[in-house]
Amino acid sequence: SIVTKAKDLNMPAVALTDLGNMYGAFKFVREALNHEIKPIVGCELYVAEDRLKQKFTKDNPDKRFHQVLLAKNKNGYHNLAKLSSAGFIEGLYGIYPRVDKALIKEHKDDLIALTGSLSSEIPHLILNVGEKQAEEAFRWWLDVFQGDFYIELNRHGIPEEDRVNETLLSFGKKYGVKYIAANEAFYTDKEEANAHDVLL
């Protein structure tokens, strides 16, 4: 499991950020505490322009990006749970429980936001739209989360990440935003790669 692997690696803390849901949070927290590891509960939310919109066309499809939020404390956990629940109750489209920026802003207290991976808003804008638009989005997240907004640097061996990281670091320098190193982990050992591919 994630927790036993973290213990083997002498990690003081470990985070769980499942896509769109928090089903594993209770078991994860219990296991982490049993192993004397600090659990960080998070969620990688699907963020749409309007979570309530249900009608789309080929020319105007449902556009959504991934957004990692981490709970700082119990209140943050409750806000994260509200966001995740609203995604299913109000924003479910197909298999995607969606939230939007207005809802995130409403429930932002005691949550940490990261710039995210290539499937997140700011990296997507850097690569596909322009740095000006990416900087505008960066400033929105910074204005909302202030000191609880962090740049996430990824290195999965994907060439596009180098450009994203360089641009994010320049934004960080300009606005005084701190950064963390993170990689998405979908399994704990490379021997599990084939099983993960089968699940996909």
Would you name each region that the model predicts?
Residues 1-200:
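Phosphodiester-processing cores and adjacent nucleic acid-binding clamps
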